[in-house]
């Protein structure tokens, strides 16, 4: 058995994976193509370069990503340690000096005696234990290799996702359960609109601000993923023949067809999350909350994952990966980072942490670990490998992914505190054996 692991990509996930492997006494060949070849978004040769915001989001345990960070601290995360050491004032968030942060991660990983760095582009997947963590801007050559490995239908180049909501925040008195024409089981929650409600929603939608596209994302709308706001601007009634079509969705309370209907579809196996069908969007997040809360039943909706449209190379993890981040068709191959369908800096690093632990265990001949759904780390791994493979889209950490508490706690902050307490206690117990 080889006593090394190849890690391709020294971003957040790859750097974390390399650290976790190296600290377990296994040699790491870490490949990073920068500065030999840059992506359209990166500017330095440092590991874990943050190309967008300098915030790793909330630190408080009343937020799922705060719980995720705390779990990672208990598992000796290099990324979170570097973030803590290079933090800048940001209220309740963990924000960093991006240059200091990247330098910290680079020094920490590069100087580990078990890590050897190769600054070159990897164009084919090497033999032997390997973690692929090349991120959303994977090079064209490696993308072709991945397409060959996974099958073209399982590799995506754009992330076009509708908002995802907490079911508990939906006003169930204003919606009804029904499938179009009553075909099959009643699988959708339907939000009926009057003409007046539709007009108000339409005007807000076409007036809302969108996120500016980066130059390398300009072709995204030609990929068959039309944003709801672009559709609306093509004509006031365009949406009524598309995602808001009311035909076959008569309201059982009135027996009449609404003027328009917004459908919500279950997004996770537990039924705690719902997505807005056909509402992929490029609106700014604040505008999404304001506009989509005009939909009847969603006035108090909690959005756990905002709609996004951007360049993002990722695989269909429910079809291809195990919750260990291991590739189903090659036991010594692992994936990590945004390529797996986790969304966000911290989530990417967390996936690298698990992939790194498991790659090291694989080399040692030890049983691989699947972290429990009671933890933020484990719930993400479970979600991306078990959700509906036909409608799979990337997801960030949220309490809706964690295993149900088994008791109903109405107060949201108290409920989140209970999720956090259980998650951290679980990680503390598990960490002793990792």
Curated annotation (Swiss-Prot):
Which one of the record's GO molecular function terms can you name? tRNA (uracil(54)-C5)-methyltransferase activity, 5,10-methylenetetrahydrofolate-dependent
In short, the EC number is: 2.1.1.74
Q: What is its main location?
A: cytoplasm
Taken from the UniProt entry, a GO cellular component term is: cytosol
Q: Which InterPro entries match?
A: FAD/NAD-bd_sf (IPR036188), MnmG-rel (IPR002218), MnmG-rel_CS (IPR020595), MnmG_N (IPR040131), TrmFO (IPR004417)
Swiss-Prot/TrEMBL GO biological process terms:
tRNA methylation; tRNA wobble uridine modification
**Catalytic reactions of this protein:** uridine(54) in tRNA + (6R)-5,10-methylene-5,6,7,8-tetrahydrofolate + NADH + H(+) = 5-methyluridine(54) in tRNA + (6S)-5,6,7,8-tetrahydrofolate + NAD(+); uridine(54) in tRNA + (6R)-5,10-methylene-5,6,7,8-tetrahydrofolate + NADPH + H(+) = 5-methyluridine(54) in tRNA + (6S)-5,6,7,8-tetrahydrofolate + NADP(+)
Pfam families tied to this protein = GIDA (PF01134)
What keywords were assigned to this record? Cytoplasm, FAD, Flavoprotein, Methyltransferase, NAD, NADP, Transferase, tRNA processing
Q: Does the keyword Cell inner membrane apply?
A: no
The protein's required cofactor(s) are namely: FAD
Residues at which FAD binds: 9-14
Q: Where in the cell is it found?
A: Cytoplasm
Describe the function of this protein: Catalyzes the folate-dependent formation of 5-methyl-uridine at position 54 (M-5-U54) in all tRNAs.
Task: Show the PANTHER family listed in the entry.
Answer: GLUCOSE INHIBITED DIVISION PROTEIN A, METHYLENETETRAHYDROFOLATE--TRNA-(URACIL-5-)-METHYLTRANSFERASE TRMFO
What does the sequence similarity comment in the record state about its family? Belongs to the MnmG family. TrmFO subfamily.
Q: What is this protein called?
A: Methylenetetrahydrofolate--tRNA-(uracil-5-)-methyltransferase TrmFO
Q: Which organism is it from?
A: Bacillus pumilus (strain SAFR-032)
